[in-house]
Regions:
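Acidic, Ser/Thr/Pro
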Residues: 1-155
Length: 155
């Protein structure tokens, strides 16, 4: 099985609360699809107090009238996505994101959406940079995550 036949997936620790912290990851896209970029905020399993604190930072995830009630803690990041080619890299996305809707929850983390973008097959590099010092994230494990978007009928 070649690297291009594997689904794109990135999951790396990221110092989202430390200004200037940067993580970079290379990945391959096999099929033209929408890919989702997240910040995952982890909580300690079995610690209800810690889970509730992280939930407040992640926001409510509720959508009255199609809008989020509370996006939680603003986590300003700059996301750059480049397609890697024989003649170097070409920019696909270079944008600052501040407020992230809480989009989901797993057994050990809450997911805050950065963005979704269509990617064509090929090799890519994603780089995310923290733009502010955020004391509330000091003892929270945050991961930068990328995966194929669930089909929601939109872009």
């Amino acid at each position: 099985m070649s690297a291009l036949s594997l689904p794109a997936h990135v999951d790396v620790p990221f110092g989202a609360g430390n200004k200037g912290s940067v993580v970079e990851a290379e990945f391959s896209v096999a099929k033209r699809k929408t890919y989702t970029f997240y910040l995952n905020l982890y909580f300690m399993e079995g610690d209800a107090q810690n889970k509730e604190r992280v939930r407040k930072l992640a926001g409510t995830g509720a959508y009255p009238d199609g809008r989020q009630i509370d996006t939680g803690l603003a986590i300003p990041v700059r996301l750059r996505v480049e397609r890697i080619g024989n003649n170097g890299a070409s920019s696909i996305l270079d944008r600052i994101f501040t407020d992230h809707d809480r989009e989901g929850m797993a057994a050990d983390h809450f997911s805050k959406l950065i963005t979704r973008i269509w990617l064509e097959p090929g090799p890519y590099r994603a780089k995310v940079e923290a733009l502010e010092n955020i004391p509330e994230l000091e003892d929270i494990s945050v991961h930068f995550n990328l995966l194929v978007a669930h089909d929601r009928g939109g872009p």
